Amino acid sequence: MPSFDIVSEIDEVALRHAVENANRELSTRFDFRGVEASIAQNGLAVTLKTESDFQVRQLEELFTKACLKQNISAAGADKPEELEHSGKTFSLTLTFRQGIDQPVAKQIVKLIKESKIKVQASIQGDQVRVNGKKRDDLQAVMALLRESKIETPLQFNNFRD
C-alpha cells in the first residue's frame, strides 16, 4: 500500500549557508556601512543584531531572502513580538522548529479527512504518515496540503509505492 510521511525539517547546513550569504550581502550593503550589524547562528536559532529597530527589520528581510535562496521557509521560525533592546543594540532571535507539533498535526489530519480523499492519516510523533490505495490519491493529498494555509513549512518524504 503506497504511503508517505509529512515532516517539517530544517537543514542546518542550508541554514548556515543562508546566514553566511546574508552576512556577505550585509557587508556590501551601503545602508549598513559604518553600522554594527551582524547575523549569527547557534544551532537552529539565528540572531540579528544592529543599532536601530528599523535596521533590524531590514536585516530580517535580507535574511529571509537568503533563506528562500536556500529553500528554507523563514515563515516557520518562531519570532518574538518585540525586539530585544540592550544598550545601543537591538536584536531579534529567530528560532526554527524541527518536526510538526501536535496541534498542527491534528489540523493536517482534520484537513485530509474533510477532503474526502480515500486515504488514512495518522500522527506518528513529530510527523504524519499518510496511507492510501492509489498513488494518485497521495499526490492529491500533497497538492491539498501545498495549497492549504498551514503556517508550518511542510516537506514530503519516504514515499513508498
From Swiss-Prot:
Pfam families: DUF520. Transmembrane segments: none annotated. The keyword Nucleotide-binding applies. Gene3D superfamilies: 3.30.70.860, YajQ-like, domain 2. GO terms for cellular component: cytosol. Keywords: Nucleotide-binding. One of its GO terms (molecular function) is nucleotide binding. The keyword Nucleotide-binding applies. CDD domains: YajQ_like. InterPro entries: DUF520, UPF0234-like_C, UPF0234_N, YajQ-like_sf. Belongs to the YajQ family. Nucleotide-binding protein. This is Nucleotide-binding protein ABO_0048. It comes from Alcanivorax borkumensis (strain ATCC 700651 / DSM 11573 / NCIMB 13689 / SK2). The lineage of its organism: Bacteria, Pseudomonadati, Pseudomonadota, Gammaproteobacteria, Oceanospirillales.
